């Protein structure tokens, strides 16, 4: 009957009718993912669950599944590769839905059978109520570049080893245009987390390979860059915040760069505010493509990527746009060229202390901000106090530097700034500033002019007295006495700005003359224009008078070139620095100098050029201070410039706040143990305080470059790097530029100096092997210390960092297994098991110190990873990041906490059960073996010491089996002559047992022995005996 129905073709029909289930929620579920609302589609049939096998699976079918399960709309319909331990049997084949059905059973269902299903046809549904949250590229310079990942509620799936097909779908779904860069196919492993054809509308429709979910090698991560990515940089400037503007990586036409766009670029590069936008390829001609689109920024965007674009203009590289930004600014004045001096610290503006601020520092700042020359440097909060805390950094400029960060900066030993004592500057406001170099005063020397903030030479061709007169007038000096040809500086050290200058003599500025602007030095020998003015105008400038500033008189202490712990007194008068003669120089004069400079009290007054002979003018002689004056020029003296001595008698002073540095015990002059001279004594410095900004300042102050590496403990040897290693950059490096010592700007605090043991001095240097252990002395964690809290042990919990005197947390934005790997390594806790977010170990307290951490996984510490600036976290503590590490030990790594107790109990119970089974087997088998051995006594023809070697599992030797089976074994007891009959099958069992043990036992003396009462005469068939 069955065969007949099958022959008629009714068999499959009846089978399908019999297999159709009664539809219902209990017959459908999603499995093998993070929640019940996303995962593999499973259906139940005859009490067993199986896959749905579809060659074509779209959002229409996935939408029906999500609707039936009450999980919201479908957001993805990918394919799936099962894990090795997951079920592999399919039940339902070829489902087709329109998308509006209320349950899967209303769709067109194919066959119900267990026919083989290709792995690529196993289907998945991702619903909106599931754990999937967002798709993004992280750790790049814009949302259209970075490492691809899928962020879920319970963590992040890093999508490593993707190729161009997957990158195409990624870029398309993010709205970032076509893919520009993707990992090569010959890089990394063959298998991938997901596989796309490149035509899918969403990455959720690509095929998932769940075998590879936890096998991502973070070292093989490669960045995906889409065409929508825009990244700005400045090239060819004198510091990292100035140069030719290039955007990924083409130049921009100068006509297309407006002030709003410039503000966004400066903000993106963390370079403060816009100073100027020089045109005409001021920073050199670029190469490669030129942007034909123009950025239409509003000015408040955080990235250039967010600015809309419009139609731009066509230009060549002769019109490449330039941009100059500055981390310094002047505020609260009548213009941007006067006001309170502020600079950017950790994204905020802070005023600078006026204690050490002088006209030389103001000169550099005015030039840096393209504001001409400095007119005055008033202190005492002349332009208001501001709302932020006053920053105590002290700049020691000569006045000729092109950028304020090029000046020596000191922070060690700086006393707290008095409230309201903020630094200020008043600049001339001329965009084209002028100065005279290498002369005896500010009114004679070689002419240099600043065009758009860049100092340049003025060549001597066509130079005459009329041009010199214009220069003297512009500088506020008296009439020109001489126009001469000055020796040019070394070729290439200063670029040429003007040539063929022809003036009428009536102009107010040199740039109003008939000039030729050029950046090229002509071939052959060229000399510069020089001028000598008849003298300085004795009155203050109009701008200085407007602000009630009596004049530009400044005092400073100049170090000798070797960096000894002391200062020579010097004064700035009439724009030129000069020294003080030691005639009648005593401690009362020194007290006035130390008080005026905010350096405490005078420890000693030194003469005879103790700190080396100075240069330039000798301004003061025969000083007669009483010690209570507020400024040195209030003391009686012989008058300005009146003296009868040379620089071999320059005066010097030691103040109680004097700080000097030296390196000793190293292999070169720029490596060694760091000693600090403070309050008249040499002492060691704790390595706790050696962060990258301090190291940079130390190396610059010692003339050893602009960056350093500090090694703590017994290897605390700061190693300084010279400028040529950083491509000529002179500023303090930012965290994103030097990852090897990448720490944010630390908060300013009194220097952590430890007094030397038994008065450390130059005569008794500390041994190079002595460690500087300051932990007990400091009584607080080291800056940047790391810990975990709220976990089960010391290797799991919420990640916390010590910074600025308090513990803070890390935001889980961008937090993944690579970041956790660095934390676990830094804690000495082995490998990372999980990177957790959403305050998995409870919310922390205090500030959120780090956000968007971007570790690669190979860094030695968390502060070596790129991240948002310290304290810039934009989340509350409900998104605190955590880690779970596996500390290497005798056992395998433990899983997450919810499963740990289960596995421990399972192992213990399994071990007890195994021991119980072994004991039971011994109890049952051992008596039988013993009795069988007793029964077989006397049957062997070999001695006890001989062994019978045979192959286990083969039959007994020929004849033995038949001999035993033909007759009963008879054992004669010599004492009573009784005969005992033995079951032949039991005897066979005993003989075989003896043979399997490799020996035969002979009965001794031929005596019969009684049979044990425990023998049950059970036979063991040969075919069932196995080892």
UniProtKB/Swiss-Prot annotation:
Note the Pfam families from the entry.
SRCR (PF00530)
PROSITE patterns per record: SRCR_1 (PS00420), SRCR_2 (PS50287)
The entry's note on the tissues where this protein occurs is: Mainly expressed by CD4(+) and CD8(+) T lymphocytes. Also highly expressed in small intestine and colon. Expressed (at protein level) in small intestine, stomach, gall bladder, and placental villi.
Which parts of the chain does the record assign to the membrane side Cytoplasmic? 928-1027
* Residues carrying sugar: 94, 129, 332
According to the record, the signal peptide region is 1-19
Q: Which GO terms describe its biological process?
A: T cell mediated immunity
Span of domain SRCR = 28-128, 135-227, 232-326, 328-428, 434-534, 555-656, 661-761, 786-886
Annotated localization: Membrane
Task: Report the superkingdom from the record.
Answer: Eukaryota
Supply the alphabetized keyword list: Disulfide bond, Glycoprotein, Immunity, Membrane, Repeat, Signal, Transmembrane, Transmembrane helix
User: Looking at the UniProt record for this protein, which Gene Ontology cellular component terms does it annotate, in alphabetical order?
Assistant: brush border; cytoplasm; plasma membrane
Chain ranges sitting on the Extracellular side read 20-906
UniProt entry tagged with the keyword Glycoprotein? yes
Instruction: Specify where it is mainly localized.
Output: membrane
The disulfide bridges present are: 53-117, 66-127, 97-107, 160-216, 171-226, 196-206, 253-315, 266-325, 297-307, 353-417, 366-427, 397-407, 472-533, 503-513, 594-655, 625-635, 824-885, 855-865
What does the record give as the function of this protein? Answer: May play a role in the immune system, perhaps as a co-receptor on alphabeta and gammadelta T-cells.
Any idea what this protein is called? Scavenger receptor cysteine-rich domain-containing protein SCART1
Organism, by scientific name, is Homo sapiens (Human)
Gene designation per UniProt: SCART1
């Amino acid at each position: 009957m069955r065969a007949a129905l099958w022959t008629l073709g009714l068999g499959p029909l009846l089978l399908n009718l019999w297999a159709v289930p009664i539809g219902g929620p209990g017959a459908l579920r999603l499995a093998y993912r993070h929640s019940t609302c996303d995962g593999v589609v499973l259906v139940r049939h005859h009490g067993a669950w199986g896959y749905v096998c579809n060659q074509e699976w779209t959002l229409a079918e996935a939408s029906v599944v999500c609707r039936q399960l009450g999980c919201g709309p479908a957001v993805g319909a990918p394919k799936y590769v099962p894990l090795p331990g997951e079920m592999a049997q399919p039940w339902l084949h070829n489902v087709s839905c329109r998308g509006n059905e209320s349950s899967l059973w209303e769709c067109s269902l194919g066959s119900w059978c267990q026919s083989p299903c290709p792995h690529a046809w196993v289907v998945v549904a991702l619903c909106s109520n599931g754990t999937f949250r967002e798709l993004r590229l992280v750790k790049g310079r814009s949302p259209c570049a970075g490492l691809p990942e899928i962020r879920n509620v319970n963590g992040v799936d890093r999508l490593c080893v993707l190729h161009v097909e997957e990158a195409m779908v990624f870029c398309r779904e993010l709205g970032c245009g076509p893919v520009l860069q993707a990992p090569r196919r010959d890089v990394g492993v063959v298998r991938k987390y997901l596989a796309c054809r490149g035509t899918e509308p969403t990455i959720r429709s690509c095929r998932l390979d769940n075998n590879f979910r936890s096998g991502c090698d973070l070292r093989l991560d490669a960045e995906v860059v889409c065409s929508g990515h825009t990244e700005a940089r400045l090239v060819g400037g004198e510091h990292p915040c100035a140069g030719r503007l290039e955007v990924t990586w083409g130049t921009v036409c100068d006509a297309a760069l407006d002030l709003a766009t410039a503000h966004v670029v400066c903000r993106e590069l963390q370079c403060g505010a816009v100073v100027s936008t020089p045109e005409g390829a001021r920073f050199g001609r670029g190469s490669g493509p030129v942007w034909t689109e123009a950025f239409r920024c509003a000015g408040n965007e955080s990235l250039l990527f967010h600015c809309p674009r419009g139609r731009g203009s066509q230009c060549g590289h002769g019109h490449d746009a330039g941009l100059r930004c500055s981390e310094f600014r002047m505020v609260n004045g009548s213009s941007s060229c006067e006001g309170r001096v502020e600079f950017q610290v950790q994204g905020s503006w802070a005023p600078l202390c006026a204690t050490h601020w002088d006209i030389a520092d103001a000169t550099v700042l005015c030039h840096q901000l393209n504001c001409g020359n400095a007119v005055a440097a008033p202190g005492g909060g002349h332009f208001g106090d501001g709302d932020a805390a006053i920053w105590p950094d002290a700049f020691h400029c000569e006045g000729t530097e092109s950028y304020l960060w090029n000046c020596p900066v000191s922070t060690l030993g700086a006393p707290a700034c008095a409230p309201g004592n903020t630094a200020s500057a008043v600049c001339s406001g001329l965009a084209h500033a002028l100065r005279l170099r290498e002369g005896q005063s500010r009114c004679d020397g070689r002419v240099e002019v600043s065009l758009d903030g860049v100092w340049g030479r003025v060549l001597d061709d066509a130079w005459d007295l009329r041009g010199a007169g214009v220069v003297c007038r512009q500088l506020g000096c008296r009439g020109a006495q001489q126009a001469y040809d000055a020796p040019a500086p070394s070729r290439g050290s200063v670029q040429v700005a003007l040539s063929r200058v022809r003036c009428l003599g009536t102009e107010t500025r040199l740039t109003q003359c008939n000039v030729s602007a050029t950046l090229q030095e002509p071939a052959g020998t060229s000399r510069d224009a020089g001028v000598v003015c008849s003298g300085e105008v004795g009155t203050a400038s109009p701008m200085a008078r407007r602000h009630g500033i009596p004049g530009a008189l400044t005092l400073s202490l100049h170090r000798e070139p070797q960096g000894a712990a002391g200062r020579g007194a010097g004064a700035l008068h009439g724009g030129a620095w000069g020294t003080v003669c030691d005639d009648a120089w005593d401690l009362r004069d020194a007290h006035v100098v130390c008080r005026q400079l905010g350096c405490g009290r005078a420890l000693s007054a030194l003469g005879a050029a103790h700190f080396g002979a100075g240069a330039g003018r000798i301004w003061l002689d025969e000083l007669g201070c009483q010690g209570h004056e507020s400024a040195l020029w209030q003391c009686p003296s012989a008058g300005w410039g009146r003296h009868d001595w040379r620089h071999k008698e320059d005066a010097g002073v030691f103040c109680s706040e004097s700080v000097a540095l030296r390196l000793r015990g190293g292999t070169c002059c720029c490596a060694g143990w760091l000693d600090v001279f403070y309050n008249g004594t040499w002492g060691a410095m704790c390595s706790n305080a050696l962060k990258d900004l301090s190291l940079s300042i130390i190396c610059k102050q010692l003339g050893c470059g602009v960056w350093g590496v500090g090694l703590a403990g017994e290897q605390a040897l700061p190693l300084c790097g010279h400028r040529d290693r950083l491509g000529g950059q002179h500023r303090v490096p930012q965290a994103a530029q030097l990852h090897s010592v990448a720490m944010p700007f630390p908060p300013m605090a009194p220097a952590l100096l430890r007094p030397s043991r038994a008065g450390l001095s130059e005569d008794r240097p500390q041994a190079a092997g002595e460690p500087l252990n300051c932990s007990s002395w400091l009584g607080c964690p080291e800056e940047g210390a790391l810990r975990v809290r709220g976990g089960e042990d010391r290797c799991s919990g919420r990640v916390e960092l010590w910074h600025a005197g308090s513990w803070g947390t890390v935001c889980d934005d961008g937090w993944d297994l690579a970041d956790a790997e660095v934390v676990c390594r830094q804690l000495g806790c082995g490998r990372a098991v999980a990177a957790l977010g959403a305050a998995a170990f409870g919310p922390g307290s205090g500030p959120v110190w780090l956000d968007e951490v971007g570790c690669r996984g190979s860094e030695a510490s968390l502060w070596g990873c790129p991240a948002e600036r310290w304290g810039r976290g934009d989340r509350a503590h409900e998104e605190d990041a955590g880690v779970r590490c596996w500390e290497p030990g005798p056992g395998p790594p433990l899983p997450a906490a919810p499963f740990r107790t289960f596995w421990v109990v399972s192992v213990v119970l399994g071990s007890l059960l195994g021991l119980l089974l072994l004991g039971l087997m011994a109890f049952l088998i051992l008596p039988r073996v013993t009795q069988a051995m007793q029964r077989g006594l006397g049957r062997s023809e070999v001695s006890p010491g001989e062994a019978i070697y045979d192959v286990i599992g083969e039959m007994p030797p020929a004849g033995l089996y038949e001999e035993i089976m033909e007759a009963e074994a008879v054992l004669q007891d010599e004492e009573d002559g009784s005969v005992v009959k033995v079951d032949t099958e039991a005897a066979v069992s005993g003989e075989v047992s003896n043979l399997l043990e490799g020996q035969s036992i002979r009965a001794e003396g031929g005596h019969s022995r009684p049979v044990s009462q425990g023998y049950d005469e059970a036979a063991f068939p040969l075919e069932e005996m196995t080892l």
